[in-house]
């Protein structure tokens, strides 16, 4: 087995829905383990919460407000000692829509 130039591949995943994020992480872990690479993680990172407060009406009733929030869930994982087969399998992997993936070699 030939190894890739780096010792690890760091993958950072972001999504609004944690269930979709966990499915994507499970697919990546299964793919990496099936090709003989080690996996460290997934490590749950702190969730970013963006809160927005708006008036319910246009003119009056300043006391009547509505709050919305947007949560961004994140996971971090390392693939240790990846082979060329691991990199090829990860490139062909189709993840669910709504998952943002950042890969650092």
From Swiss-Prot:
Gene that this sequence comes from: rpsJ
An annotated GO cellular component: ribonucleoprotein complex
Pfam families documented for this protein: Ribosomal_S10
Classification via Gene3D superfamilies: Ribosomal protein S10 domain
HAMAP family reported in the protein's UniProt record: Ribosomal_uS10
One BP annotation, GO: translation
Family membership: Belongs to the universal ribosomal protein uS10 family.
Lineage of origin: Bacteria, Pseudomonadati, Thermodesulfobacteriota, Desulfovibrionia, Desulfovibrionales
Protein name per UniProt: Small ribosomal subunit protein uS10
GO molecular-function term, one example from the UniProt record: structural constituent of ribosome
Record keyword Ribonucleoprotein present: yes
Membrane-spanning segments: none
Family matches, as PROSITE patterns: RIBOSOMAL_S10
Sorted UniProt keywords: Ribonucleoprotein, Ribosomal protein
Stated role: Involved in the binding of tRNA to the ribosomes.
Cited InterPro entries: Ribosomal_uS10 (IPR001848), Ribosomal_uS10_CS (IPR018268), Ribosomal_uS10_dom (IPR027486), Ribosomal_uS10_dom_sf (IPR036838)
Complexes and interactors: Part of the 30S ribosomal subunit.
Species: Nitratidesulfovibrio vulgaris (strain DSM 19637 / Miyazaki F) (Desulfovibrio vulgaris)
């Amino acid at each position: 087995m030939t190894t890739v130039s780096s010792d690890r591949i760091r993958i950072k995943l972001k999504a609004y829905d944690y269930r979709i994020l966990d499915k994507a992480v499970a697919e990546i872990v299964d793919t990496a383990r099936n090709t003989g690479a080690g996996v460290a993680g997934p490590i749950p990172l702190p969730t970013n919460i963006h809160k927005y407060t708006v008036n319910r009406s246009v003119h009056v009733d300043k006391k009547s407000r509505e709050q919305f929030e947007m949560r961004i869930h994140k996971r971090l994982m390392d693939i240790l000692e990846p082979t060329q087969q691991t990199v090829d399998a990860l490139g062909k992997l189709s993840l669910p829509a709504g998952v943002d993936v950042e890969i650092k070699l």
